[in-house]
């Protein structure tokens, strides 16, 4: 963002020919909580739910990266237990954060060509699919575009990033933002773990 604003003259075509949408923090309450209380917190801070195992402990939040509608709730890496870090929520888009982002994208689905989300921890660029060990038909195109991003980071920072599907590099998981059905019209959908 800073480069686009402060160094506009370097690449004016990037400003003049493209509409840019930035959402600096998609989970503001979770972000604040991770800075004030628990630095590894990844969920939202939505209302407390009773622990399903014991019924006494109050558990907060939903993992926004398991709350998207595409194959929501499938597999073993999104939990129905509100006390786990990967709790998917009671239904897809149950969280106002994920619902707002999905609505924003849907109203611009014919305009948005690239959807990039920055995620915390690791040095990976993940492209779909994450919910299964298969690649979508546009995988090669996404891979080539993402590879350019990885190479640019390498050139500037000297940092190596792994590139592949979440299923290849991590594990299969459903309800992820980069797999979300609202993003299926984008030419590039990936998550950069920084």
Predicted regions, residues:
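Short helix-loop-beta-strand segments that form the rim/entrance of peptidase-like active sites
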Residues: 1-34
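"Short basic amphipathic alpha-helical interaction patches in structured regions
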Residues: 36-38
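Metallocarboxypeptidase
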Residues: 41-194
């Amino acid at each position: 963002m800073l480069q686009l604003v402060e160094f506009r003259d370097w690449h004016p075509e990037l400003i003049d020919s493209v509409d840019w949408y930035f959402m600096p923090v998609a989970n503001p309450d979770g972000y604040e909580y991770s800075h004030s209380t628990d630095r590894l917190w990844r969920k939202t801070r939505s209302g407390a739910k009773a622990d399903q195992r014991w019924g006494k402990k109050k558990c907060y939040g939903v993992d926004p990266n398991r709350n998207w509608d595409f194959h929501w709730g499938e597999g073993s890496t999104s939990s129905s237990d509100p006390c786990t870090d990967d709790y998917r929520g009671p239904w897809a888009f149950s969280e106002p954060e994920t619902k707002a982002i999905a609505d924003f994208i849907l109203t611009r689905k014919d305009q948005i060509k690239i959807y990039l989300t920055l995620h915390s921890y690791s040095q990976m660029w993940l492209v779909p699919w994450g919910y299964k060990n298969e690649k979508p038909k546009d995988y090669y195109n996404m891979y080539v575009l993402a590879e350019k991003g990885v190479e640019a980071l390498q050139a500037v920072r000297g940092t190596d990033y792994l590139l592949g599907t979440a299923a290849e590099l991590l594990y299969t998981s459903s309800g992820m933002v980069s797999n979300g059905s609202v993003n299926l019209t984008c030419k590039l959908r990936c998550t950069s773990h920084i």
